[in-house]
Amino acid sequence: MKTSIAPRNVSADTDCGLFVFGVLAGMLALASCSSRPDAFVAPSDVRDGLRVSDNHHYVVDARTGAPVFVLADTAWNLGALKLDEIDTYLRSRAEHGFNTVMFVLNFAPQAQENNAYGQPAYLGPDKTELNPAYFETCDAIVRKAADRGLYVMLYAMWAGEKAGTMNGYTAAQLKALGRALGHHYAGVPNVIFCAGGEASPHYIEVDRVNAIGAGLKEGCEGRNLVTVHPVAENSDSRFYAASPWLDFYMSQAKSGSAPKNAAYDAAALVLGDWSIAAVKPTMMAEHRYESGTREDPLMQRRSLYQCVFAGGFGYAYGHDALWQMTPHTGLPWMLKGWTPGVENWTQALDTPAVRQLHYIKALLYSHPYLTRIPDQSVVLEGQGGDVFTRVQATRDGTPVRNDATYLMAYISAPRNVVLNTGVIAAPILRVYWFSPETGASEVIDGELPNPGRLSLGERAQGGDWIVVIEDASRKFPLPHFLPAEGR
C-alpha cells in the first residue's frame, strides 16, 4: 500500500501545527536561547568532558552519558588575534550555536610562527618544549571557551604538503612534544587533541603521526579525546584505523571555495567509516569553505545534513576569512584558492549559513540519539544521482530490521520521494516537514495510519527540506521543545 501526502499549510492553533523559531521560542525556552531568540546555544557548562559512546559511533558527556553533537567552527589561525579579539570571536560562535572551535598551535608557515603577542608555541633545540608564555595565553583561550560552553580542538601543528612544519620532526621528537602537550592539558574537560592537520600520507608518514598521537594519549593519561586530521579526499580510517590512541575519525573532502568543490561527495567518506571493523565515531572536519558574505547557504546546509545523516557525530563549518583570520594570513598561493571575500574576519561572523546550521542540533536532540543509524534503503523512489539532488536518510533501530521509532530524510532539492515507513514498528505515524533554513516544523499529519510506503509530493516552496516520520505514540517533542542540558 502506498499513501500520498501533498504538502499543506496548517494554522498555528492546529494540534502540533506550524511552529517557527522566534520570539515565542525565546519565551518558552530561555534555557536554550541567547539574545538571538532563534539561536540554539550550547550551555555554559562543559566541565564534564567527553568520551566515546558505548556503541562507538558517537561522543557523549563523560559524566552523564548524554549525547553531544559536535558543531565546530574552523579557526586555524586563531593565535593571530589578541585575547580581546578572541573573546569577540568566541562569543559569536557560542551565540550561533557552535560548541567547538578548532585551531592550530603552530600554523607556520601558513601564518606567523608566533602568536599575536610574539610568542612561539614550542622552544628548545628540537622545538619540543612548551613555551610557558605562549601557553599562558593559550590557557586563557581555553578558559574563555569553557566559560562560553565551547570545546577547543587543539591541533599540535600542521603537516600540509606546502604549509606545515610537522615534517621537520623525527618520530621521537614528535612523541616527546605530544607527551608534553598532552600532560599540560590532561583532564581539562573542554580540550580535544588533534595530532596534526593534514597529517597523513602522502604528506607525512604514518609512523610519525602515530608517534605524536601516542604521545598525546600518554601525556593526558587517556583523559581527553585524541584524533588527527587527514589530507583531502580521505578519512583517518584509511591510515589509522588500527592506532590505539585514535578516539574518532575525521574526514577532509574538498576545502577550496571553487564552485566545483561543492559537487564532491563528502558524505561518502562519512558513510564509509560507519561499517568498517574498527568502529569509531566519525565527523566531517573540512569541506568547501564559504567565501564572502553572500553565498547561498544551501551549499553548507546540504553538506552538513548529508554528512550527519550518513552517520557523522559532528561537522565542522569553515569560512576562508575565519580560518585565515583575515588579514593575518599572508601566503599568496593560499589566497588564490581560498579567497576570503572580505577585508576583515569580523565581517564573516554572521553569514546566512552560520545563522542556520545550528538548527540540526534541535532536530537531532528531539529524537533518540545514540541508536541513530544511516539507512538509504528507506528511500524507495526519488533518490537523486548526485549531492545536489540526493535524498539522505537516517533512522534509529537496527539495520535490516523494522524496529525504528522514527526516520528522517534530507531532500536536497524539490522532487517526489517515496519512503519505506514499514521500518517503523507502529500503526500510527506523525509526519512533519522541518526546514533547515528557518528551523520551522510543519506537521503534515499527526495521526496517519502507517501505509508502509509513503509518497511525498514535491514542495512548492522549493529548496531543501527534511521530512520527519515518527511513531505517533512516542510523542517526541517538536524540535524546539528541548531540555536545557541538550547541547
Outline where the language-model segments fall.
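Short strand-edge motifs at loop-to-beta-strand transitions and within beta-strands
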Residues: 452-454
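Active-site mouth of glycoside hydrolases
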Residues: 45-258
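C-terminal motif of bacterial Sec signal peptides marking the signal peptidase cleavage site
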Residues: 31-32
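Aromatic- and carboxylate-lined catalytic core of secreted/periplasmic carbohydrate-active enzymes
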Residues: 66, 290-291, 300-445, 457-487
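Aromatic (phenylalanine/tyrosine) cluster motif
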Residues: 19-21
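Short, low-complexity, disordered segments immediately C-terminal to signal peptides
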Residues: 37-42
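N-terminal secretory signal peptides that target proteins for export/translocation
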Residues: 1-16
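Extracellular glycoside hydrolase catalytic/binding regions
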Residues: 192, 197-343
